[in-house]
């Protein structure tokens, strides 16, 4: 893994910082694990924008990732590491002893030729997947299930991890990178170690066009709009918006709590750090 700062041969290259990983596969992805990934430009079936700042970008195939890791007791060899345009983490193509291939999120430190395994009896080693009740307290994990059997939902992006800090009956307590401490059912599965490609946060795209290649459109300030488009819009000349900052739909947008799922508040031991 190398961090490369490009020479300023043009204004668009001046600030580019690239993450170069020589271990990534340079060929095409494994075709049986690809799916069509159509773009909708952030529009729904009525043609109305439901997600802002989405549109354009390079065509992509979706890589089918094994987030459940339910193939127990069968060891798998890591064939290669690959880039995935759909996420910040890299992915690993693994070949099971019975001949099946699957993609998994590539943990930190894993290389081609390494062996990974899942199941209750899997050893405590980076890349192995076990129920949380079988993982020692103090261990670092990623790809954590919130509901047993649903598949990993927590700590899936580049450099992400959670730490097991306590075990109490049917639950284990995790400390997330945000500082939040929450309880998770101990029957849910997690993968040992942390997600690789942690240098992802150091990259600099360098120009607006590189963001457009990724399918992200510009964010326009509300005060630059007309009154019909945003509560901050309109006015003669430049204005401050004339009110406390709100979203395009009038919801206070700075420091206003919008969490609605009160039924799961009981699982949050401590809120995240501000």
Curated annotation (Swiss-Prot):
Gene Ontology cellular component terms for the protein in this record: large ribosomal subunit
A GO molecular-function descriptor: structural constituent of ribosome
Disulfide bonds: none
InterPro entries the record matches: NA-bd_OB-fold, Rib_uL2_dom2, Ribosomal_uL2, Ribosomal_uL2_bac/org-type, Ribosomal_uL2_C, Ribosomal_uL2_CS, Ribosomal_uL2_dom3, Ribosomal_uL2_RNA-bd_dom
Example GO BP: cytoplasmic translation
Alphabetical keyword list: Ribonucleoprotein, Ribosomal protein, RNA-binding, rRNA-binding
Pfam families in UniProt: Ribosomal_L2, Ribosomal_L2_C
Location of the region described as Disordered in the Swiss-Prot/TrEMBL record: 223-274
Classification via Gene3D superfamilies: 2.30.30.30, Nucleic acid-binding proteins (2.40.50.140), Ribosomal protein L2, domain 3 (4.10.950.10)
Primary role: One of the primary rRNA binding proteins. Required for association of the 30S and 50S subunits to form the 70S ribosome, for tRNA binding and peptide bond formation. It has been suggested to have peptidyltransferase activity; this is somewhat controversial. Makes several contacts with the 16S rRNA in the 70S ribosome.
The family this protein is said to belong to: Belongs to the universal ribosomal protein uL2 family.
Assembly information from the UniProt record: Part of the 50S ribosomal subunit. Forms a bridge to the 30S subunit in the 70S ribosome.
UniProt cross-references to PANTHER family, sorted A to Z: LARGE RIBOSOMAL SUBUNIT PROTEIN UL2M, RIBOSOMAL PROTEIN L2
UniProt-recorded name of the protein: Large ribosomal subunit protein uL2
């Amino acid at each position: 893994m190398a961090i490369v700062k490009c020479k300023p041969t043009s204004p668009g290259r001046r600030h580019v910082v690239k993450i170069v990983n020589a271990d990534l596969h340079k060929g095409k992805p494994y075709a049986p694990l690809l799916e069509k990934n159509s773009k909708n430009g952030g529009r729904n079936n009525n043609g109305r924008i439901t997600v802002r700042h989405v549109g354009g970008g390079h065509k992509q195939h979706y890589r089918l990732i094994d987030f459940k890791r339910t193939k127990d007791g069968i060891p798998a060899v890591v064939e290669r590491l690959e880039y995935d345009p759909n996420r910040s983490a890299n992915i690993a193509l693994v070949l099971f002893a019975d001949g099946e291939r699957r993609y998994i999120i590539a943990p930190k430190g894993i290389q081609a030729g390494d062996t990974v395994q899942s199941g209750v009896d899997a050893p405590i080693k980076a890349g192995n997947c076990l129920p949380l009740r079988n993982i020692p307290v103090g261990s670092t994990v990623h790809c954590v299930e919130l509901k047993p059997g649903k598949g990993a939902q927590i700590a899936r992006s580049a450099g992400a991890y959670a730490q097991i800090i306590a075990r109490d009956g049917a639950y284990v307590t995790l400390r997330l990178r945000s500082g939040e401490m929450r309880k998770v059912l101990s029957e849910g599965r997690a993968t040992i170690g942390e997600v690789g490609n942690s240098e992802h946060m150091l990259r600099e795209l360098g120009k607006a066009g590189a963001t457009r290649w990724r399918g992200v459109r510009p964010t326009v300030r509300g005060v630059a709009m007309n009154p019909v488009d945003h509560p901050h819009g309109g006015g003669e000349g430049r204005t401050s918006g004339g009110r406390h900052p709100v979203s395009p739909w009038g919801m206070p947008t700075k420091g206003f709590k919008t969490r609605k799922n009160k039924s799961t508040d009981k699982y949050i031991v401590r809120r995240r750090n501000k």
